[in-house]
Amino acid sequence: MANMTNKITRRSFGALALGSFSALALAACGSSNTSGSSSSASASATGKKVAPSALPSGMGTTTVDGEFPRTVKHFRGETTIKSAPSKVVILSTGQLDGVLSLGVVPVGAATAGDADLVPTYLKTKFSDKSAELDKIAKVGKRTDPDVEAIANLKPDLILINNTNKKDELYESLAKIAPTVVTEGTGINWKQDFLLIAAALGTTEKAEKLMEEYNTKAKSVGQKAGSEKTFSFLYASADRTRIFAKSSFVGSICADASLARPAAAQVEKTSIDLSSEQLDQADGDYLFYGVQGGDESKLTGEALWSTLKAVTEKHAHSVDSDMFFLNAGPAAALGVLETIEKAL
């Protein structure tokens, strides 16, 4: 079957409510729903989902940037960090994006399954730090961190999120170094970024990055207008899903006031689609990724060539790491830039 697509590539408490944030992203897995809802959408319906843009009350720190020691309240209690961290280990989704965006290259990181330790979009974004990125040590997988390998790095700060609820793991990590726990899941990417900044003592820099993101989101939204719908589709080994309101890309669309297909306007991270339901992912613009890079898993489907986005050459293959598998300011800006190029 002809592949009628275009391929786009790209190269705490002290943080107040950030009035410039839009009050409006990707869990490791989404909810499944195979009911046959209509694929039509109201062009004015953005399917907005509020993505927390400030830390929950009482979390973070009241200590000013650059001052140590500092005590940070987080999702597993509170942790005192004695000096500015220089040997950080990150163990969860979005945290590599977050620390690099704040100017810190970690000494160790966990991977998502068999994925690359440093995703391509981060290698491109932070190419000036390529030598340092190459030295990051692998410390197991996000679902099963290697505690011994972490200890051997002698870190002075460990970051993990609260989706890993093993008390014994947190206790083991806290014995190695000060450990700060973010909430996790893509929809919480903004508040988690602020919590990372609170631990590093770089809240002002984080706020400036979010202001840049908000400005870009507004600009892309104005350029896109309110009449076009935007859809995001990802195929892995055992499922194909459209990303919905409670996802990383869903939060970005809400911030940019981009309209979504009806199937994406649900309070879930994603919706599983069968081959017969692929038309529910249609929109004026379709951004898709395939695990392993074999796009025929989608483009070879019988309904693919019937999609409006495909026939009008508005179906774009994108970097899955950036769109669907990570969540942070660098990824968010990359998603917006990719959408803007497609318009």
Where are these regions (language model features)?
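Extracytoplasmic substrate-binding proteins
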Residues: 78, 167-236, 329-343
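Extracytoplasmic ligand-binding site segments that recognize negatively charged/polar headgroups
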Residues: 113-119, 165-168, 183-195, 231-251, ...
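Short helix-initiation/N-cap motifs at beta->coil->alpha
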Residues: 139-146, 266-274
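Proline-aspartate-enriched helix->loop->beta-strand connector
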Residues: 154-160, 178, 283
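Alpha-helical, coiled-coil/dimerization segments enriched in small aliphatic residues
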Residues: 242-271
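Structured C-terminal subdomain patch of bacterial secreted/periplasmic proteins
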Residues: 281-343
